[in-house]
């Protein structure tokens, strides 16, 4: 049994986070081709009996496209207006595509405040449990339309790790526009080497994770490493992989060397 098979076997609860750069064209308009491939893979996993939670960015990006804005809004009210419009566009798209496979989705919008007290945490957990028990695929996003800066998660990488911990997931997959974690920035160093497995999120690993997010997103590699820290500390395996690859999710669960695997603690 190889390392991947050891840590990626028997996945019953899976959280998949998809970033804005994977879901949208550079213009901000939704990339239906990519979304369809992601939906198909999730629908197939659902049919295998795996309980999948999708953490989806893209609300602001979809709003930018719908409102025909030339660039990402800079002020908080403008961002929130774009998110309010875009979240509806995003959910309508998911609802329509999953319905083609006979599957139902439910929306959960979370803020950091929702996880600030035990009572509210239990309430969120109960909502997830009820949806999953009814065979519904929860689609999660931060409530960008109303949340204030002081209580923002700020990126869905961190949010997805918190959700994975909350529902006691076996695996967290972060789909981005990069193949995984490199030993140096591949945009600067053409000889950068993709790291297959990370046994511990230490200072050396954090140093490899410099760099900003994409134009339409908020999370760079540093936020993904923070997500890995949260996930692995809670006994959850995590993989960073490229959402551009059509079968990335399937490849990961087939133990192929897709992306970078982060080994969980105490498992």
From Swiss-Prot:
Binding-site residues, ATP: 17, 176-177, 218-224
Keywords, comma-separated and alphabetical: Amino-acid biosynthesis, ATP-binding, Cytoplasm, Kinase, Nucleotide-binding, Proline biosynthesis, Transferase
Protein name per its UniProtKB record: Glutamate 5-kinase
Encoding gene (name): proB
Regions that span the bilayer: none
Short name of any one Pfam family annotated for the protein: AA_kinase
Subcellular location(s) per record: Cytoplasm
Catalytic activity from the UniProt record: L-glutamate + ATP = L-glutamyl 5-phosphate + ADP
């Amino acid at each position: 049994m190889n390392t991947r098979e050891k840590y990626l076997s028997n996945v019953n609860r899976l959280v998949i986070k998809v970033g804005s750069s994977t879901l949208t064209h550079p213009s901000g308009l939704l990339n239906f081709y990519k979304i369809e491939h992601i939906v198909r893979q999730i629908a197939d996993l659902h049919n295998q009996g795996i309980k999948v939670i999708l953490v989806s960015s893209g609300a602001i990006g979809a709003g930018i496209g719908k409102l025909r804005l030339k660039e990402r809004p800079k002020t908080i009210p403008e961002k929130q207006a774009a998110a309010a419009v875009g979240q509806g566009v995003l959910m309508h798209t998911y609802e329509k595509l999953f319905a083609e496979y006979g599957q139902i989705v439910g929306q959960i919008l979370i803020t950091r405040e929702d996880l600030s007290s035990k009572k509210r945490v239990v309430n969120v957990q109960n909502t997830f449990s009820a949806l999953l028990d009814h065979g519904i695929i929860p689609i999660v996003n931060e409530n960008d339309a109303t949340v204030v800066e002081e209580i923002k998660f700020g990126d869905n990488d961190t949010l997805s790790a918190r959700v994975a911990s909350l529902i006691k997931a076996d695996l967290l997959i972060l789909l981005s526009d990069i193949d995984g974690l490199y030993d140096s920035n591949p945009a600067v160093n053409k000889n950068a080497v993709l790291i297959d497995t990370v046994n511990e999120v230490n200072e050396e690993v954090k140093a490899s994770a410099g760099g900003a997010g994409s134009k339409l997103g908020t999370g760079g590699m540093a936020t993904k490493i923070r997500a890995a820290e949260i996930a692995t500390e809670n006994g959850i395996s995590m993989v960073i992989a490229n959402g551009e690859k059509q079968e990335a999710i399937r490849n990961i669960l087939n133990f192929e060397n897709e992306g970078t695997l982060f080994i969980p603690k105490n498992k």
